[in-house]
Amino acid sequence: IQLQNLPQNHLPDLREARELVKTGNYEAMEFLYDDIPDTLSQLIRTAFVPREGMKFIVADFSAIEARVLSHLAKEEWRSEVFKNNGDIYCASASAMFGVPVEKHGVNAHLRQKGKIAELALGYGGSVGALTVMGALEMGLTEDELQPLVDSWRSANPNIVQFWWAVDRCVKKTIKERIDTETHGIHFYYKSGMLFIELPSGRRLSYVKPKMGVNKFGSESVVYEGVGGTKKWEQIESYGPKFVENIVQAISRDILAYAMRTLSHCFICGHVHDELIIECSEDVSLDAICEQMGRTPPWIPGLLLRADGYECDFYKKD
C-alpha cells in the first residue's frame, strides 16, 4: 500500500464518523454528512489499527529539508531559528521584509508570504514555482511575485551561493572528468556516470551525463533517466535541481539513521519523513521523538527535531 497517496483526513469528528461506519449506522451517516464518498475516503487511514492493548506513535521531522539546506549552505540565521524552535515562516518573512513578524501578532499577514516563499523558492524556484504553489489563490498579485523571489534570495545569499557552487562542481566534473567538492559534497565521474557522494557515504548516480543547451540558450547538464512520461529519456538539470536531489537524499539518510536508532521499536510504516510505530501503552512519545531527533555522526552540527502524537488508529494529526 502507498500510504502517501491516501486521502488526508480533515473531519473534526473523525472518531465519531469512524464509529458510525464500524457499527453500520448508514442512516446516521447520510443524515450527518453531505458528501458520503469524501467522508469514507477520509476514513481509509483509520482502517489501520494497532494490535489489542497497543497504540500507534506517529512521529515526523520538523522542517527537515529546510534544516538540511540551511546547514549545508551555512545560512546561519536560519539555523538559529531552528535552534530556538522558532517559526521559519515568520523568520523568513521578517528577513525578507525587514520587520518583525509574529504568527498571531505584529505583521502576522506577512507570514503567509514567508510560508509560500519557503515552500517554492528553496531550490531555485521563481515566479512560476510561486504560481504553481498557489500564490495567486492565496491572495498575492502577479506584480508581487518577482519582488518576493528577489527578497527571498537577498535574505538567503548563502543558499543561492550553494546552488551555483554545486552547479560549477557538476559541470567541471563532467567536462574535465575530475573530482570536485563543495559544502562537504563530493562529485566525481566514473564509468560513464556522475556520482555525488553524500555525507553518509551513499552516492547519487546520473547516467551518461553531458553538457547541453537549455531552452534559454544557456549551458546545462543532461543525463539519461526515467522522465515525467515514465520513459527512459534525456533529463535536463542544473545547480538548484541537484541541490534538491542532495537535500532530499540526505533527509532520506537521516530517516534511515533514525529507524536504526529506533530498531528496538516495531516500525510498521514510514512515509516521507514520518515513522509509524506500534508500541505498548507505557512507551513515551517524548522518548521516541528525542531518539528520532538525534543527529547522525556523519553530519555534525545539524539541528534536528521530531514531533509526534499518539493514536489508536492511523490518521494525520
What do these predicted ranges mean?
Residues 1-317:
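Conserved catalytic core of nucleotide polymerization and phosphodiester-bond processing enzymes
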